[in-house]
Amino acid sequence: MKKNSLIKGSIIVACMGFLHSCYFGPISDPYYVPESRQQENVYYVPSSPNTQLLSEKNDIGFDLVASGGSKFSGVETQASFLPAKHVGLIAGYSSGKNDDGSNTYMKFHKFEGGVGYVTNLSKGWHFETYGGVGTGKIDNFHATGNSKVDLTNFFIQPAFAVSNKRKTVQFGIVSKFSGVNFKVDTTFDNARELYSTSQVISLHDQPFHIMWEPGLVFQFGWKSFLFHTSYSLSADLTNSQLHRATDNFSIGGALRFNASKKVIQ
């Protein structure tokens, strides 16, 4: 009886092993990370146009906006000041991330500052052009590790705008060109994340890229406070295959005032 029981037990174990080997269900941890997961990690994020459209000496502006686009959402603060009739200063800081509510795939922050020329072309028409430099960092959280992208850039940003007499309604067109230098450091598994590896290799081979970011700016409200919104696209003129955020939509508020002291006659 014991011998028969052993034989029956062996047959059952063998059948279970055979059936298990024939199971074609999903694999919980595939060797190769799906490309869709790898594409949650991005290597460049554009900021919204820092085009506050100030026009008078000693004008000061502050913007606070929520921004978002393909593969990111964030917050931006911008400031500008006209210390002279035709001279302007700008600065901007942006930060954000790409997540799905339970997993964070990317975080970034970026700072830019510049100086520019400002003039009124005719009644209601405004022109400005700013140039400056910036720096930033992108941290990607891959399925098998991490990557860090350090960015430095210089830019030029001309803009035309039209406004009503009180400058409580303004519409502008901006065209920003940036030269961006990428420096990448990685710790993820190159063999398992082939798409991400190809992106990193392309940045090592060509670390300097020219970006073109045309956009529209619209703001309306009162003399000292305006609702502000903008939309811009981002095109990589050096390597269109670089996986990046390709647009930026922002909405928020803008404070405006003039720092000139009033003289009582």
Describe the function of each predicted region:
Residues 33, 74-76, 80-81, 90, ...:
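Outer-membrane beta-barrel proteins
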Residues 142-250, 254-265:
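Outer-membrane beta-barrel transmembrane domain signature
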Residues 63-79, 94-108, 121-123, 165-168, ...:
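Solvent-exposed loop/turn segments connecting transmembrane beta-strands
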Residues 26-27, 54-62, 73, 85-87, ...:
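Outer-envelope beta-barrel architecture signal
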Residues 81, 86-87, 92-179:
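Gram-negative (and chloroplast) outer-membrane scaffold detector with strong preference
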Residues 22-61, 261-265:
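Outer-membrane beta-barrel biogenesis signature
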Residues 55-59, 84, 88, 92-94, ...:
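Flexible, solvent-exposed coil segments and beta strand-coil junctions
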Residues 1-22:
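Sec-dependent bacterial lipoprotein signal peptides
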